């Protein structure tokens, strides 16, 4: 039989209001009364109803998490960092997969609000104008991790993609590359815009230009990388910058199948540095994003908003580095 708050109150010989105050951490309870109620709660194995507690305290200690593709290892590493910090601060996560579908994202966002979550966090992906509007009108705090929504008013955690692209491009030029391709995702996000800007900046410094026919997009998957290489093959560049590890590996394998030598004929750098980069041969050169930290810092930033703590900087930029492995010279 389910133990109720009434059972605890009767056993402890206090009012249900007193039990509720103890359960919700209200300090206006005498220590001896609190101890007695907690002893009864433990003995009866009473489990407070989370929804009822939320109605009483106006908090549910739950956060909504929206992930574009839960099967993608990039997002799973972000989620791991987020979940560890959520647990540390005693929050529970409701994780929803949006399939990179803006309409589904809106539906999930509104559904999470109806569940009275205390906050929402987006992990990577695209922040559409409609979602941005929902975020700005949201009754609960929202943070985006792994993207920044092209809006300084939205709290975010990310790396400096422009700087990373500049560093990668400069390195490749020093290794002899003169023609470049940029492979992005099918949706425009600020990270991709920043990579494009960084690439063009360095190319212009060396009197080089990006051929528009070599700026391609796909869905960030391995198969997309294979299809992308088919488009590149007739006008093969010296180097490719790839937003996604999976895309980059698809290009690598297709190049090898076509007899293209990597890195002698084609150099490749990706921007995710998931565990996949060390599972291929040659190992993939990649911009190292601190994925766990991006998720963790995003969750910590959200807890600050939810608990009305002071926010020094709502747009956090974490350090990156580039690991040059076997796909670059």
From Swiss-Prot:
Domain of life: Bacteria
Descriptive protein name: Catabolite control protein A
Domain HTH lacI-type: 1-57
SUPFAM superfamilies reported in the protein's UniProt record: lambda repressor-like DNA-binding domains, Periplasmic binding protein-like I
Alphabetically ordered keywords of this record: Activator, DNA-binding, Repressor, Transcription, Transcription regulation
Taxonomic lineage from the root: Bacteria, Bacillati, Bacillota, Bacilli, Bacillales
Residues within the DNA-binding region(s): 5-24
Record NCBIfam families: ccpA
Function: Global transcriptional regulator of carbon catabolite repression (CCR) and carbon catabolite activation (CCA), which ensures optimal energy usage under diverse conditions.
InterPro entries: CcpA, HTH_LacI, LacI/GalR-like_sensor, Lambda_DNA-bd_dom_sf, Peripla_BP_I
PROSITE patterns xrefs: HTH_LACI_1, HTH_LACI_2
Species the sequence originates in: Staphylococcus epidermidis (strain ATCC 35984 / DSM 28319 / BCRC 17069 / CCUG 31568 / BM 3577 / RP62A)
GO molecular function term, any single one: DNA-binding transcription factor activity
Annotated CDD domains: HTH_LacI
UniProt key word Transcription: yes
């Amino acid at each position: 039989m389910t133990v109720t708050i009434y059972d605890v109150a009767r056993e402890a010989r206090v009012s249900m209001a007193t039990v509720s105050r103890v359960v919700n951490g209200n300090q206006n309870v005498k220590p001896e009364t609190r101890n007695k109620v907690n002893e009864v709660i433990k003995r009866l194995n009473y489990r407070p109803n989370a929804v009822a507690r939320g109605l009483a305290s106006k908090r549910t200690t739950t956060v909504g998490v929206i992930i574009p593709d839960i099967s993608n290892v990039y997002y799973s590493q972000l989620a791991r960092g987020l979940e560890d910090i959520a647990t540390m601060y005693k929050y529970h996560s409701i994780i929803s997969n949006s399939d990179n579908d803006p309409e589904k994202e809106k539906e999930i966002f509104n559904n999470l609000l109806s569940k009275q979550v205390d906050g929402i966090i987006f992990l990577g992906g695209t922040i559409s104008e409609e979602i941005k509007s929902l975020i700005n009108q949201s009754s609960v705090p929202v943070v985006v991790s792994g993207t920044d929504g092209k809006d300084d008013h939205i709290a975010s955690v990310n790396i400096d993609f422009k700087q990373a692209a500049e560093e990668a491009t400069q390195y490749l030029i020093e290794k002899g590359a003169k023609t470049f391709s940029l492979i992005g995702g099918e949706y425009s996000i600020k990270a991709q815009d920043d990579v494009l800007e960084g690439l063009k900046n360095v190319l212009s410094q060396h009197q080089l230009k990006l051929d528009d026919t070599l700026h391609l997009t796909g869905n960030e998957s391995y198969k997309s990388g294979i299809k992308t290489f088919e488009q590149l093959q007739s006008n093969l560049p010296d180097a490719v910058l790839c937003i996604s590890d999976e895309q980059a590996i698809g290009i690598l394998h297709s190049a090898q199948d076509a007899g293209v030598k990597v890195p002698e004929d084609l150099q490749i750098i990706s921007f995710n540095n998931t565990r996949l980069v060390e599972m291929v041969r040659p190992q993939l050169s990649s911009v190292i994003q601190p994925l766990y930290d991006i998720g963790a810092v995003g969750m910590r930033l959200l807890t600050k908003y939810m608990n009305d703590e002071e926010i020094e900087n709502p747009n956090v930029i974490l350090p990156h580095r580039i690991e040059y492995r076997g796909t670059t010279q």
